[in-house]
A protein has these predicted regions:
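N-terminal nucleotide-binding beta1-loop-alpha1 segment
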Residues: 1-21, 70
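Conserved alpha/beta core of the MobA/IspD/sugar-nucleotide pyrophosphorylase nucleotidyltransferase superfamily
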Residues: 2-5, 157-253
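Residues at the starts of beta-strands that form the adenosine-phosphate
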Residues: 4, 49-51, 97, 202
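Short catalytic helix/loop segments, enriched in acidic residues and glycine
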Residues: 22-37
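Nucleotide and nucleotide-moiety/phosphate-recognizing core
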Residues: 30, 45, 51, 59-66
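A short, N-terminal amphipathic alpha-helix
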Residues: 33-50, 90
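Conserved beta-loop-beta/alpha segment of the NTase-like Rossmann-fold superfamily
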Residues: 63-135
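Conserved core of the sugar-phosphate nucleotidyltransferase
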Residues: 108-184
């Protein structure tokens, strides 16, 4: 079965300022690899050759990917005013048997090399201990999501990627086309929009270890994973700070 992927890369990631003044978060070098390039290579390794990347903020920084990896870029010029649902909307014609990814996630192991003989649609999830701000989920004995909450405690939560099969994609696309111009719908995360139609859209929980999918929330979070990040960030801002303070990058703290 042929599968494709849509990588969402339009956002600004303002919690990584000032570094995102120079380049988008998806272009950060982490442990010697560009985040989005690592993800593209993992998709290609799994046989997913049709890859669409939705760009917006500093879109020109991603142009080289077309020639280097043969990906298809889709421009979302309204990234600053709208949620990532709108990025899926501008890529809606490509939704089929599709992985939905974010450019700035780091998959320790390749999650796209998998067994899914029934081709079910799923959302990657992990168990969080304590309070969290991600989308929490409740699910049935059959592992079908039955409720979505914003934040939670000591429960399963959405993390990383999702997979839509062709039937799910057709329904999701239809709902987007019907509702995208309604008040505040375009401002939503796609997960919020899915939650509105949860009874009509069956999405399974696929559990991952909480150390296998990383979503860096800030610079210090990233540095805990890659202690050499500031040495490899290729930032004029860091260079200027080091010049003024006469220090090396790893001596800089928040």
């Amino acid at each position: 079965m042929k599968k494709n992927a849509v990588i969402l890369a339009a956002g600004k990631s303002s919690n990584f300022a000032p570094f995102t003044y120079e380049k988008p978060k998806g272009i950060f070098c982490v442990k010697g690899e560009i985040l989005i390039e690592r993800q593209i290579k993992q998709l290609l390794e799994a046989g997913v050759e049709e890859i669409h990347v939705v760009v917006g903020y500093m879109k020109e920084k991603f142009f080289y990917l077309e020639e280097k990896y043969g990906v298809h870029l889709i421009v979302n010029n309204t990234f600053a005013e709208k949620g990532n649902l709108y990025s899926l909307y501008v890529a809606r014609e490509y939704l089929a048997n599709t992985y939905i990814c974010c450019a700035d996630h780091y998959f320790v192991d390749n999650p796209f090399i998998e067994e899914n003989p029934l081709n079910y649609s799923y959302r990657a999830c992990t168990f969080y201990q304590g309070k969290f701000r991600e989308f929490g989920v409740a699910y049935s004995d059959a592992m079908v999501i039955t409720d979505v909450s914003v934040g939670g405690m000591d429960q399963m939560a959405m993390v990383g990627h999702a997979y839509f099969n062709e039937s799910f994609s057709a329904k999701f696309r239809n709902y987007m086309e019907q509702e995208i111009d309604r008040f505040r719908v375009a401002d939503m995360f796609w997960e919020e929009f899915y939650a509105k139609h949860l009874k009509e859209l069956s999405l399974y929980v696929k559990e991952f270890d909480n150390r296998s999918i990383l979503e860096f929330e800030g610079i210090e979070d990233l540095r805990q994973f890659d202690s050499e990040f500031l040495l490899n960030v290729d930032s004029d801002i860091i260079s200027n700070i080091c010049s003024v303070l006469k220090c090396n990058p790893n001596e800089i703290n928040e």
